[in-house]
Design a protein with these regions (language model features):
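Short secondary-structure boundary micro-motifs
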Residues: 26-29, 58-60, 77, 94-97
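Core segments of cupin and vicinal oxygen chelate
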Residues: 2, 9-51, 103-105
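Short acidic, gly/pro-rich beta-turn/loop elements at beta-sheet edges
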Residues: 20, 52-54, 63, 85-86
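A short, local hydrophobic-aromatic micro-motif
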Residues: 6, 31, 72, 96-97
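Vicinal oxygen chelate
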Residues: 1, 4-13, 42-45, 63-107
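A short, acidic/glycine-rich surface segment
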Residues: 39, 53, 58-64, 97-98, ...
Length: 107
């Protein structure tokens, strides 16, 4: 089965204000809130599109400079991650992290 877009993750400065905005402006619902070692996260959905709002506590684990905002990553769901990685690399893409177990951040 082909990979499917699962979510778009945004780095934000004020996670609660941003979640409030997406609720009020687009009718999205908060589906989960999580505090990990390096970031707070709020997951939102309108039933079709999913957003992951990320507010990092510092630069550790974020991959971006402190205070940076914008698209952090796109999350895809697939049935066979090692096979998908090979397909991505064959198409000219690259992985920035090794495959492993999900971390405490909820990913």
């Amino acid at each position: 089965m082909a990979a499917r877009l699962r979510h778009i993750a945004l780095c934000v400065k004020d996670i609660d204000a941003t979640a409030d905005f997406y609720e009020q402006a687009f009718g999205m619902k908060r589906t989960k809130k999580h505090e990990g070692k390096t970031a707070w996260s709020v997951y939102m959905s309108d039933g079709e599109v999913n957003l992951a709002l990320l507010q990092y506590k510092g630069e550790e684990g974020s991959g971006v400079p402190k205070g940076w905002t914008g698209i952090h990553h796109f999350g895809f769901q697939c049935d066979d991650l090692p096979a998908q990685q090979k397909q991505i690399e064959k198409a000219g893409g690259q992985f920035f992290f090794d495959l492993g177990e999900p971390e405490d951040e909820g990913f």
